[in-house]
Amino acid sequence: MDVHAPTSAYTPSLASKRLIAAHGDREGATVGLMEVSEEAVQRYGIVAMDGDCIVDMVEKPSVSEAPSRLALCGRYVFPHNTKEALETCSYEEHGDLQSIALQKRWMDQGHLHGAVLDNTQWYDSGSPETWLQAQVDHALRRPDLGPAFAHWLEQRLNDYR
């Protein structure tokens, strides 16, 4: 997961299509999951599964507390009534509305499903450094921006050194 292919190896992702197909006509929500290394579990929300149902979530667990190596990767298919359901969640716990409270509610009801999205490039945008890396990679992969952006980036790096 932490190893990225060169930008020349880019092909469009089918992860969203795969997630929608996995969701089908289910009640509740389906979330994308990626398998991470044992050392990386402490950086993500990690889930336990029973078939395709998520039965437990642990936010940034230690290796010994992690129920698996399956991490929530920020791709979701939520039902049409999600906005109304979010309004019933408390602001107090996180200081704003977060979907994790709603996901836990669906999990408790047996309506939170997971789909492993292997063979997919995953960018973790949880830190400024990894967010910037994702932006640079995406810019370099775009035929309309990549060549000019690469030239500019090379000049900036030369100026920086």
Tell me what each language-model feature is.
Residues I20, C53-H151:
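Catalytic-core segments of class I nucleotidyltransferases/pyrophosphorylases
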Residues P147-R161:
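Terminal low-complexity segments of carbohydrate-biosynthetic enzymes
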Residues M1-D50, F78, L86-C89:
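Conserved beta-loop-beta/alpha segment of the NTase-like Rossmann-fold superfamily
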